Amino acid sequence: MFHGSLVALVTPMHEDGRIDEAALERFIEWQIAEGTNGLVPVGTTGESPTLSHDEHKRVVEITVEVARKRVPVIAGAGSNATREAIGLAKHAESVGADGVLVVTPYYNKPTQDGLLRHFTAVADAIGIPLIIYNIPPRSVIDMSVATMARLAQHPNIVGVKDATANLTRPLHTTAACGASFCQLSGEDHTALAFLAAGGVGCISVTANIAPRLCAEMQAAWRAGDLKTAMAIQSRLLPLHDAMFAESNPAPAKYAASLLGFGSEFCRLPLAPLAEATKAQMRAAMTGLGLLA
């Protein structure tokens, strides 16, 4: 189903904070040309918490329209309000998204039973695949493997974006949910190790800037060429470090601006990058030949 390098798209903006639709369209075309295996708009990296509902939906619509089924689109549809998540998921389905990514509800700290009910309600409301997004550092709730196994029995819940950074999780998830449950890493630094533990791909922040290398690493692993996969991951390490030197997506948006895709602007409360972080990013990109 979903595999390889899927990019967690930034949302390009003008300097005044308006969404730069033309830059987004060019960015998507470039991503596909560079070999990205899938597009994931309006997630954490897409600044979904600071987008209005209309903006959120428009970004999904543009992504689907430009992609034209050349690669799958997994639209962000997360919320800490179940009714809102259902609405976003139904919109994504209505405009042609291939799946939805639904984050564990943040701030209100539901119990495991609450998580079970939330995801079941969203999955019941749509007819396209749903990927659970488990990211305890941001949501302050960790879905247990037992809860995930129960949700995996739902025909529309097909996998997880695992951003726990715990490399024992995919092993336990495979044991509980079966090998067909689609496990995608949400951590660029451990993406290769995640594959070795049972994953099938990565929803990547770094792929915003180095889509070809990220896709080639995933392809090398699938081809059984571990030496090449390890070499690419080693080359990417300085860029991974720069990408997460400050809160995502500020570094990624600065890097994208250097490539000509929108400005570096992030909506508050995300602040502009420190000059030292900008220098780190430029050095990492130059080292990979992404900047002259």
Curated annotation (Swiss-Prot):
A Pfam match: DHDPS
Swiss-Prot/TrEMBL catalytic activity: L-aspartate 4-semialdehyde + pyruvate = (2S,4S)-4-hydroxy-2,3,4,5-tetrahydrodipicolinate + H2O + H(+)
GO cellular component, one term: cytosol
Molecular function (Gene Ontology), one example: 4-hydroxy-tetrahydrodipicolinate synthase activity
Main localisation: cytoplasm
Site (Part of a proton relay during catalysis): 44, 107
One Gene Ontology term from the biological process aspect of the record: diaminopimelate biosynthetic process
Active-site feature positions: 133, 161
E.C. number: 4.3.3.7
Disulfide bonds: none
InterPro entries hit by this protein: Aldolase_TIM, DapA, DapA-like, Schiff_base-form_aldolases_AS, Schiff_base-form_aldolases_CS
Pathway the protein takes part in: Amino-acid biosynthesis; L-lysine biosynthesis via DAP pathway; (S)-tetrahydrodipicolinate from L-aspartate: step 3/4
PROSITE patterns: DHDPS_1 (PS00665), DHDPS_2 (PS00666)
Binding positions (pyruvate): 45, 203
PANTHER family for the chain: 4-HYDROXY-2-OXOGLUTARATE ALDOLASE, MITOCHONDRIAL, DIHYDRODIPICOLINATE SYNTHASE
Family according to the record: Belongs to the DapA family.
Assembly and binders: Homotetramer; dimer of dimers.
Function of the protein: Catalyzes the condensation of (S)-aspartate-beta-semialdehyde [(S)-ASA] and pyruvate to 4-hydroxy-tetrahydrodipicolinate (HTPA).
Protein name per the record: 4-hydroxy-tetrahydrodipicolinate synthase
Gene source species: Acidiphilium cryptum (strain JF-5)
Taxonomic lineage: Bacteria, Pseudomonadati, Pseudomonadota, Alphaproteobacteria, Acetobacterales
